[in-house]
Amino acid sequence: MAELDLMAPGPLPRATAQPPAPLSPDSGSPSPDSGSASPVEEEDVGSSEKLGRETEEQDSDSAEQGDPAGEGKEVLCDFCLDDTRRVKAVKSCLTCMVNYCEEHLQPHQVNIKLQSHLLTEPVKDHNWRYCPAHHSPLSAFCCPDQQCICQDCCQEHSGHTIVSLDAARRDKEAELQCTQLDLERKLKLNENAISRLQANQKSVLVSVSEVKAVAEMQFGELLAAVRKAQANVMLFLEEKEQAALSQANGIKAHLEYRSAEMEKSKQELERMAAISNTVQFLEEYCKFKNTEDITFPSVYVGLKDKLSGIRKVITESTVHLIQLLENYKKKLQEFSKEEEYDIRTQVSAVVQRKYWTSKPEPSTREQFLQYAYDITFDPDTAHKYLRLQEENRKVTNTTPWEHPYPDLPSRFLHWRQVLSQQSLYLHRYYFEVEIFGAGTYVGLTCKGIDRKGEERNSCISGNNFSWSLQWNGKEFTAWYSDMETPLKAGPFRRLGVYIDFPGGILSFYGVEYDTMTLVHKFACKFSEPVYAAFWLSKKENAIRIVDLGEEPEKPAPSLVGTAP
């Protein structure tokens, strides 16, 4: 069949509503119209009936086997009469509704009257190529209605775009290829997500183990402090007890001594009472009277009042400590209120309403500077190929030269990254950086980012808790959750980074002499303190944290160059 990409509404290529009379294998032309059939015609009719029964039997067999179209089986010629010598069909005629081998197809190729018939690849079952409404072969495709039609359907589809079946197949095959590619892409993304999730499960176990270790250590210190406080209190009470007992024993000894002295005085008085000499009596009694001590020591030890005060201090301190311990549970319950857990199983802090602000977004550099925040690079997180200078305000990728940094759990092992020492939480912040070289990334991430992993979710462009902006030497690209968004923004050496934590906004601005140009804005879901994050992926990349007192330079012909 000749190619026909588009067919105008109207009659379709020649096709009859009913199949024409079968062809004679000998003559190669249709039988003449007459009242009686020739022997050849009778033979053809008999053959057609026989072949029709065979086709029905084959179709029923195919249907029983769950293959109604007979796909996957060899299609035989309907005109080969000997069942043992039937030849494989090479074409099917949609007009005749018959399959032909190479020999029996020749009449369709040489007879001009048969050349208008619609030929296709061999099909086992012709019923599905037959219009159920008009009993005519399906010979075209209606694009708006997305269905195959016959010649008689043309009136019903008047005004529609109609193409040949071959053209429709080519179009649908192209669409199928696009669908396959899209499905393969989605499958790859899904497999990558599964891979990242499996890798993250290990990170979850490590993170939880680290938190457990910290909790055990902290509670161990707390228990040790409680035991020490208990020992100190008991020692204090024992010392007070010994002091009070010692004081009581001293008073007792003194009183016993006074009792003995008073017993002597009593005996002396009895002796003087027996003196008959008046002068002697008066002299001795007056002498005794002058030496008599009539004072008595206090027999009350005021320890009970002191103990009451000590008991009050211990009780109040204990109640306060218990309240502090109960705050552990309350704070954990607040964290667990988060409905969605991040892939790192992070917990969400509830931002207090007092931190929300209704102030408008800043638009000029002067307005941004109201939220100026001074940050520095954290040397405990810097990769061993990153050199920190200028009081930790400049970082340079010195690959392959390593720096003698101590091996710490917080240090990045694979990705050339470094975080800020300062966290960003609950408020608005603004800082500026200068970038040098293609392959630099500036962004935010959470503290729980994996420091030792080699997977993409360990870098600030490959997970759903980091947001970053990349300069690739030609343009900027925004990264989130391993998905990139090319940006149409001019090159800028100095970038302004604005964070509105309560509003969930992270914006990057190109900072020039007299203008602030928005490069990209992220809508974020901040649920814990975040940190400024930097990735220097190539050798000699450099990033410098700008002193906000420095005025931006006037634009130069090449803004983002190599590191000075």
From Swiss-Prot:
Chaperone as UniProt keyword: no
Catalyzed reactions per annotation: S-ubiquitinyl-[E2 ubiquitin-conjugating enzyme]-L-cysteine + [acceptor protein]-L-lysine = [E2 ubiquitin-conjugating enzyme]-L-cysteine + N(6)-ubiquitinyl-[acceptor protein]-L-lysine
Residues that coordinate or bind Zn(2+): C131, H134, C153, H157
Region ranges (Disordered): 1-69
Bias (Low complexity): 24-39
Superkingdom of origin organism: Eukaryota
Coiled coil: 165-203, 243-274, 320-340
Free-text tissue specificity from the UniProt record: Highest levels found in testis, ovary, small intestine, colon, placenta, heart, skeletal muscle and mammary gland. More highly expressed in the fetus than in the corresponding adult tissues. Expressed in basal keratinocytes.
Residue stretches making up the B30.2/SPRY domain: 355-553
GO MF term set: DNA binding; interleukin-1 binding; NACHT domain binding; transferase activity; zinc ion binding
Keyword Transmembrane set for record: no
Stored SMART domains: BBOX, PRY, SPRY
GO annotation, cellular component aspect: cytoplasm; cytosol; plasma membrane; PML body
Keywords: Coiled coil, Cytoplasm, Metal-binding, Phosphoprotein, Repeat, Transferase, Ubl conjugation, Ubl conjugation pathway, Zinc, Zinc-finger
E.C. designation(s): 2.3.2.27
List of residues that carry Phosphoserine: S116, S203
Zinc fingers classed as B box-type: ranges: 72-122, 126-165
Outcome of substituting S116A: Loss of protection from cell death during oxidative stress
An example Gene Ontology biological process: positive regulation of DNA-templated transcription
Enzyme class: transferase
Pfam families reported for this sequence: PRY, SPRY, zf-B_box
Subunit structure, interactors included: Homodimerizes via its coiled-coil domain. Heterodimerizes with MID1, TRIM24 and PML. Interacts with Galectin-3/LGALS3 in a ULK1-dependent manner; this interaction mediates autophagy of damage endomembranes. Interacts with BECN1. Interacts with ATG16L1. Interacts with p62/SQSTM and LC3B/MAP1LC3B.
Role of this protein: E3 ubiquitin ligase that plays an essential role in the organization of autophagic response and ubiquitination upon lysosomal and phagosomal damages. Plays a role in the stress-induced biogenesis and degradation of protein aggresomes by regulating the p62-KEAP1-NRF2 signaling and particularly by modulating the ubiquitination levels and thus stability of NRF2. Acts as a scaffold protein and facilitates autophagic degradation of protein aggregates by interacting with p62/SQSTM, ATG16L1 and LC3B/MAP1LC3B.
PANTHER family to which the protein is assigned, alphabetical: B-BOX DOMAIN CONTAINING (PTHR25465), TRIPARTITE MOTIF-CONTAINING PROTEIN 16-RELATED (PTHR25465:SF10)
Family, similarity comment: Belongs to the TRIM/RBCC family.
Name listed for the protein in its UniProt record: Tripartite motif-containing protein 16
Origin species: Homo sapiens
Gene field: TRIM16
